[in-house]
Amino acid sequence: VFINAMGMRITEEQRAQIKKAADGGLPILTTSVTNPANEIISLDSIQADTLRSYLGNGGRRNYRSMLNYVRKHIDGKLISVDEPEAVTERSNDMIYHADPKKPDDEELGFNTIAGYNAFLQENGLLQEGAPRIIITGMMGEPADLIRKLEETGNVVYPVRNMKGFIGRHQIDSVFPSAVINMAHGRMGDYIVDYLAQQNIPLFTPLNVNRLVEEWENDKMGMSGGFLSQSVVTPEIDGAIRPFALFGHYRDEEGLQHAFAIPERLETFVETVNNYIKLQNKPNNEKRVAIYYYKGPGQNAMAAAGMEVAPSLYNLLLHLKKEGYKVDGLPASSKELERMIQAQGAVFGTYAEGAFDNFMKNGHPELITKEQYESWVGKVLRPEKYAEVVSSFGEFPGEYMATDDGRLGVARLQFGNVVLLPQNAAGKGDNAFKIVHGTDAAPPHTYIASYLWTQFGFKADALIHFGTHGSLEFTPKKQVALSSNDWPDRLVGALPHFYIYSIGNVGEGMIAKRRAYAGLQSYLTPPFLESSVRGIYRELVEKIKIYNNAVNACSNGAHEQESRKDMRSEVDLRRASLAVKAVAVKLGIHRELELDSVLTVPYTEDEILRIENFAEELATEKITGQLYTMGVPYEDARIRSSVYAMATEPIAYSLLALDKLRKRADEKTVKHRALFTQHY
């Protein structure tokens, strides 16, 4: 029995059972032990070392010899067993490739680009001018991926040691268009620097590391250490498209083997090729679909912290400046907004008159049943489409439908750039729930818009404009999506870019992982001070008088005669009532749920709460005008934003240092006004 004990967590009872089997004569070898308690070996040292050597060097030949060694020298089967060969040391080849003439044999190895290119040339795999793609990493079986990439016109360089490949400058003569990393952990800063220098994408297809049917039925998709190592840490390297590609299948003996999932392989390779096409296709030929968000009727477009209409208009102007075909662009953002209200609207089911007018004058794209069903057949499994029909009826449904059975898709087209509203992803009155996810399939209108973008408009790139839409919240898996999950199907193989607020990292991660989006950050509105300190000036003065009275009482108890002590108590009561009068006048007592009886003084703790509340409001950060893409902050707004972001971390760091030096105590922490004054 071979046990890979890396990270293995078993109970004491389970461990005892394994030890009992080993003591009873069952041959057991544990490898990659991370917990010494799990190191259970019932072989002699020679046998254990021999098996470790076979495993450590890997390869078909070594594994075959290892099994023969087990049969002959451990299991005692001496008849009809081939003599095990000596261990073949693992080659340190930089590049590997299956032998096209003997694909089931050991992979061939190469240490020079010239030698590998000669091999490719000899086997008809080196195409002049073809994109070159590097594959690296260990969390997958890349044979089918390499073959499919080559079949679709690429030259593939499977690399064992990417760091060495870059460090020794062997990569310099490859000029790759993309890197594919079958990731388990970070590659490191060296790859970040290289990707930035070359301006090429890094893809990280996922190995779900279990039977395909188990993964497809799992609502989570991936979790724990595999999520961290396969999705989270590769994002630090700049990886995009965490697309489930590899899974396990059983052979005729019931053993599991990792392979590329056939339908996923087709989509992934098409995705990689589509990104590479963007590098080479002239800008005036690229077709771009941009989705924006707005509520029904005359509601304005929306995106967190952004002035949408002028920002979208600035993007269109910039695309035109960069050579994209943007025809018929209006003269101003106001005019663009008017056009969107007329031709790119979203309607509630109640707005029959406005809907009829839109269908006549809004120039929607009209989709026939034949078109729609042909597109659905390409991307959706029958059972997924059955969910749609069950919830919304047969195409075209009741919404955005014409009398002759076609479905209207709102859009504004400017040459090769089309603007589309994102329709509601469900039905009902709870807009927040519809945007942030339900368990139901999206309606025909939602699906048809995205499928028209893919197959009708034939977009080269998909953009979602602003934070945030509903696509990344459609059902079902959290990450490592399958072909049964709606974002996976509606994005398809399109390169996807999401203009996303830099202030919403958490939901941005959802867009990256569930909608395969490359995030392009936009700024939050600038930060300003609240400017309400003047409102609380009288209150602050009264609290200062009260604090002085508290100090006088504390000192008087030990040093002053009883008469002066009584006078201090009277002053303290008077000061507390004065604070209370101002606090009640300002309504602070309601916020803090304090009483408003003006003849009963507040306690010291209650006044401390009032002081901290007022100080918190006085120092609270507020945001200024909404951000417009392409328009930099004014200098004053840059300064106020930097102060707002940096002041508190610096102040609390200084406080921490003063506490270490015994220059500050808990009193400073409790009194926000004192903290603000000192730091």
At which residue positions do the language-model features occur?
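Ligand/cofactor-recognition surfaces for anionic moieties
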Residues: V1-Y679
